[in-house]
Amino acid sequence: MSKPLVLVTGCLGQLGSAIQQHWDASQVAARYELLPVDIDQLDLTDTDDLIAYLGQLHPAIIINAAAFTQVDEAETNQEAAYAINAEAVLSLAKWCRVSGCKLIQISTDFVFDGAATAPYTTDAQTNPLSVYGASKLAGENHVLDLLPRTGYVVRTSW
């Protein structure tokens, strides 16, 4: 019997690379098969290809580490930032809702304004000050709205 599949998008980025690097040494590797993909294998902004790809693989879990991360460039290229950070996440969440797949969405501390004097909690008020932060928050909201029991958001800071 084959192991359930964990699909990791954005595998050439910082987080996707780190997941791959530590996968074999983790306890998760004994129970799940890892499939890392990047934009050259799967363009998340091409909804038709995305749905077809996921339909062939039937992953049990998707870790979405793909993102438009150029904070300054997002200000002038809002369409591209929202396409990957929000609209592609919506497509993933819709597919996961129908298929029963779990979705782990990697987000950012840029959803906050940075004014807090203590560490942010999971229920802290968001207030993004940039297009990048706003686009990532939109993606978070898609996951949490469509997948209240099987969608997870992990906010990171590098």
Where do the model's predicted regions map?
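Catalytic helix-loop patch of NAD(P)-dependent Rossmann-fold dehydrogenases
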Residues: 76, 83, 88-91, 111-154, ...
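Rossmann-fold cofactor-recognition segment
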Residues: 35-48
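N-terminal Rossmann NAD(P)H-binding glycine-rich loop of SDR-like oxidoreductase domains
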Residues: 4-25
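SDR active-site strand-loop-helix element
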Residues: 9, 37, 62-66, 103-108, ...
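A generic structural motif
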Residues: 27-35
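A short helix->loop->beta-strand "cap" motif at the edges of active sites that frequently abuts
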Residues: 98-102, 148-149
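NAD(P)H-binding glycine-rich loop region in Rossmannoid oxidoreductase-like domains
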Residues: 47-84, 97
